[in-house]
């Protein structure tokens, strides 16, 4: 009857064939007193959404990853049902424009929290800090079990719990490295690996960005999908980056997209890497538009269709202008072009 019923807040759940469990839940519900307020997990700005323009499909990243069916198409934008949304954070991790931003955690608040935690660690004499991201259920329980029955976390591992690690995107990963963490480890529930494939794509994008600023290392970002605390502990004490870039601390204020650019620009400066295009994986939300200038008639159809303002006209001359930092790679301009003189290419400028 419900999509993603197990992810919805405010419900008591039991197997329909378990009559004893159903009776216990009924008794438990009867004893509940007070009000329940459904949390709002996502702050959505339809003005920034690049889902569609003029009936031409563009970005559908959030629709593709939402496991609860809380997001539906609504014309040129999408609609997010707060009653269904369970706060997995997937939409916030993949949204290229910042139209869908998670409230817990907000990208800028996350950056400030890990920076503050890092400052305290370094002031206490800590060395080679590593960041461990875990959710409040599976991840927190694994860490607790490691502390209770094992040797606990490594001394240089700084843990931070999140409502859901599904929000971990390339923006959070590169921000952590820029602030000074030499490694970022994410613990996910192995029972949900089919839902968290987007995290692998986000890590691949973060690795490509790191390679572009001369800080690539396979062990820089580590994803652990284990339920056994001993196996988690073994991986935490395993591979480490061979070399870390010089930190480039900054104030993470603004949209996830803007924060990512600040982090990469800072790392490029600390690594003495000149301005150059960074090759990115297919589907990356950064890149350029290639235009066949010999056949383009400057009809400006693409300008009026571009949802991000990346394509602009010159009011004083027949000229088509492009802002690479604004391009979302949604592909609407390519679909709009009457003569098919434009194409999209995945890359980013540091």
Placement of each model-derived feature along the sequence:
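Cysteine-centered iron-sulfur cluster-binding motifs in ferredoxin-type domains/subunits
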Residues: 45-69, 79-98, 288-309, 321-339
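Short beta-strand "wing" residues that participate in macromolecule-binding interfaces
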Residues: 73, 102, 313-314
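Short glycine/acidic-rich loop motifs that flank beta-strands on beta-rich extracellular proteins
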Residues: 75-76, 317
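Structured core of small recognition/catalytic domains
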Residues: 89, 96-100, 105, 166, ...
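A contiguous, basic/glycine-rich beta-loop/short-helix subdomain that forms a polymer-engagement track
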Residues: 105-123
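Short low-complexity, flexible loop/linker segments enriched in glycine and/or proline
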Residues: 116-118, 199-202, 327
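Conserved small/polar residues in nucleotide/adenosyl-binding loops
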Residues: 340-347
